[in-house]
Design a protein with these regions (language model features):
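Intrinsically disordered, low-complexity polar regions and short flexible loop motifs
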Residues: 1-199
């Protein structure tokens, strides 16, 4: 009787703003895993091989094979682990400043649901290539609590385990005095109770 193959759970998020990578094909070794994967979209969690070496290739949309890859990355995932992999950075630096290199940023210990029933777990990732080191401040519920401190580009700030309420967040520079951007985060309105998500 053959032993079952070891697997890991993986979600891939396309966050590369490079126009050359506005949509890509994702290969697992030579097999097409995700076809025409668009910027700012996420795959579902899927089973991936664990405890073996494999290559992820990123190719232009409508590629014909893994040989068309513009970037490749080698992995060996831990069995029974859950990962989020975010594609970030710039493929071709022309016209971009700053232009951090294209990379796949891996987070182990990802969640497919909130760890506490009734909450919403939010994994914070700083994926803006031209934003400074930032703080994230919540103003609607907590009255100004800093919920993420000094996150730099490509950093995962870990999970926020939040009551499922409607929040307003401000992204500020690392001094905490200059607001870069404000966002509504209506977790309750969107029905995200018990969910885990990445922002």
């Amino acid at each position: 009787i053959p032993l079952p193959e070891s697997t890991a759970r993986v979600q891939v998020i396309h966050n590369s703003p490079d126009a050359l990578a506005s949509a890509v094909d994702v290969y697992l070794n030579d097999a097409l895993l995700i076809d025409d994967f668009a910027f700012r979209t996420a795959s579902p969690f899927i089973d991936a091989p664990a405890a073996v070496d494999f290559t992820v290739g990123i190719a232009p949309a409508n590629s014909t094979s893994s040989a068309d890859a513009i970037a490749t990355f080698d992995y060996n995932l831990a069995a029974n682990e859950t990962y989020i992999i975010v594609a970030s950075g710039i493929v071709n630096a022309a016209g971009y400043n700053p232009a951090p290199a294209f990379n796949l940023e891996v987070f182990a210990g990802a969640r497919e649901a909130a760890s506490t029933q009734g909450n919403t777990d939010v994994l914070v990732y700083h994926g803006s290539t031209d934003a400074p080191t930032v703080d994230v401040v919540e103003t609607a519920v907590t009255g100004g609590a800093t919920i993420v401190d000094n996150a730099s580009y490509s950093d995962y700030a870990g999970y926020l385990e939040l009551a499922t309420l409607d929040y307003r967040i401000e992204v500020r520079d690392e001094t905490g005095t200059v607001t870069v951007k404000s966002y509504e985060a209506p977790l309750n309105t969107l029905g995200l109770q018990d969910a885990a998500l990445t922002v």
